[in-house]
Amino acid sequence: MMKNKLFIFINVFGMALAIACCIVAYFAYEYQATFDGNHTNASQIYRVSAIREFDNEVTRWGYGPLPLGGIVEQNFKDVDKSSRYHFSYSNFKRENDLFESNLSYVDPEFFEMFSFEFIKGDPKALKDVSSVFISDKMADRLFGSPEEAFGKTITQVYRTNLKEIKIAGVFKEQPQNSSFHSRDAFMNFENCKDEHVASTDDNWTQEATLFIQVNDPSRVSAIHKQLQPYIENNNKVREDFIIKELALDHFPTMAVNDQAAFVRSWTWSAPPPAAIVGSAVMGILILLIACFNLTNTAIAISSRRLKEIGIRKVMGGLRKQLIVQFIGETTLICFFAVLLGLVFGEFLTEGWNTMWPYMRVTPHYLDNPQFLIFMAVILIFTGLLAGAYPAFYISNFEPISILKGKLKFGGTNYFTRILLGLQFAISLIAIVSAIAFLQNANYQKEYDLGFDAKGSVIAWLDSKEEFETYRNSLQSNPQIISMAGAASGIFSNRVNEPVKHESKEVEVDIIDVGDHYLKTMNLTLLEGRDFVQDSETDKRESIIISQKMATMFGWEKPLGKEVIWKDTTKLYVVGVVKDVHTMGLWRSLEPLMIRYIGPEKYSQIVVNAKEANVPGLNKFMEAKWKEIFPNRLYNGYMLVENTDEVDNVNGNIVKMYSFLGVIALMLSATGLFTLVSLNIIRRTKEIGVRKVLGASIGNITRIINTEFVVILSLASIAGSVFSYFAVDLLMDSIWDYYLSTTTQTFMISIAIMFVVSAAVIGYKVFTAASLNPVNTLRDE
């Protein structure tokens, strides 16, 4: 080993990087596997979810009818505990300082069901409707410490209402892999009625999440059956929300399933599959490349140890002793790589965390027995995978053949060529993936969503008077192109409900907008007209639809067509707009129906300006807000923030595959460097003889490089074919609208691989070809 320090160091470094990737993958998996594991009663808790089916598509909702909470508490004897849950936001005031915080409304048994670590206070005080429980993070923000916050009185500000509430407890913030992470304030559910006047116990038009605790799992099936009759109560009054089944979601797997099925809920979902599967794929691929590297190096180095092996076998050495020695040496290399990998893992996890802002992977080694077992398995696996073939193959040679010099083993044989080809094929797949997602990111960034996402700012208001006052204050800004009011709009509060035309029923996105909304959001009117200002007829019966809605109903001439909404309301098409992606590219294009409303129903203002002026406009709107509404925090936001998430996901995937590509290519290139170097050493005399016979440097370079060029070419073909299907399959699982791989994608990727390979081995080959044959043949 000591005679080959450079090659051993290269392999230790490469293996350490691979093991560091496996460490990230392990803790990413642990993060998801232990999601909500901090709750002692997790295995006994279930969420009541609503299952809907429309047009043969089944969807799951993480909440159900509000009255179910009271019904279950009073009538379901098999349920041991229950709590409703509603998530909202509120402003809190301490003296003259105003703070915004999320706020969860729950029933008194909530803290008995879920595990919260209380620093101060008694969770039983949740029965008091005038109390609030806050996290230690919120306590630090308001008062500097949990001890200072406990027992203090703060003011809840909701619209124009002020309510004095007492801080009855301070709890430690939930871990990041918890459904209730970053939930900073909890109040008794009865307070929800102050925010939502319609939230009465018998109002089936309102929703809430309902959690139940069932200590005896054999009773769950009976509870599920007992829930089903109440579906009818909902469906009688909610034609827009017809439920097929009330299901029970087991809490330990709820967050993971919510993420997989895109369930709408008020709790945190588990990380996206790309964060878990991506890290695992990255770790496995890089580990395989590192193992192939070490195997190739061991095979190549063995050509310089054949005489040692022959002499040991002549002197009575047993084959199993040689096997143990070879595998032991390889395992020792892997052991040093594990130690270095633990160090690299600390840095790599920090980089991984920056890619997924809602996921915090924290490595912890010595206090984690499962991790230590995992590392032991990695050590044994890599030692055997990298060392088994050289050990068993070389130890099987006959000593007579070795000592007579009949064996020409080492350099590159069929096995090493296959391993090297696999390394570069994997590297190419990673490079293609990175470039393809980068191209897709640019494509989606410029994708026409059907509205102006980059030039709009939205703020929420509570009344017609507030809207008019705020709008008038903004009119002095010359950068504003247009303003409009709405109750619901694109990316904000839209609903999805069925409408009928004759015998056909279609579920459509519905938004309620006021004057100038089409102009402000830059919606393109293709046919018909916009709404007439202050027209009572338009408010009552006119709609503007998207192309998609016209297509789904099969209308070639949609103007004047009648649809029925909520079984009784007749609406008539007066205009058609270009298709609008109301939720960006996260889901397939949905049909859109736009209704006209008056200022008395406005709950938001939409302001449009040139893209370059939007950040400044947002600051201007915030300044005006503080003047007009001093007791409320500014709630405006740039609409582009909603579409930025698409860019972030694309960016994270590009980073992940770029990292994989760089590491894989680097490891493959070092493996190529090792093989070329050892091959040159083995062929030094051959090179000298060729030069004596008149071979030029170019000829010798071509002879040495030919087999490696062939290997890279075959790897390019294999990697291109596999990545063509794999990358498209991956993109299709994430997006409905994406840019497939192109010829340019593969040309750039293959060029990168060849250029890097040439740069790595070019100097080494040229130096060998330039050697003076007198020096190389001196011993002959």
Where are these regions (language model features)?
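Hydrophobic alpha-helical transmembrane segments of multi-pass inner-membrane transport and secretion
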Residues: 3-30, 270-307, 334-335, 339, ...
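Membrane-proximal extracellular/periplasmic loop immediately following the first transmembrane helix
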Residues: 25-91, 194, 199-211, 217, ...
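Small-residue-rich transmembrane alpha-helices
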Residues: 24, 247-249, 331-397, 439, ...
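Hydrophobic alpha-helices of bacterial signal-transduction systems
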Residues: 136-137, 184-185, 190-192, 201-204, ...
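Generic structural signal for small/hydrophobic residues in well-ordered secondary structure
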Residues: 11, 32, 48, 72, ...
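Mid-to-C-terminal secondary-structure elements
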Residues: 107-120, 132-271, 472-646
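Membrane-helix entry/capping segments
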Residues: 3-7, 39, 230-283, 303-304, ...
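Intracellular coupling helices
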Residues: 1-10, 14, 292-333, 396-407, ...
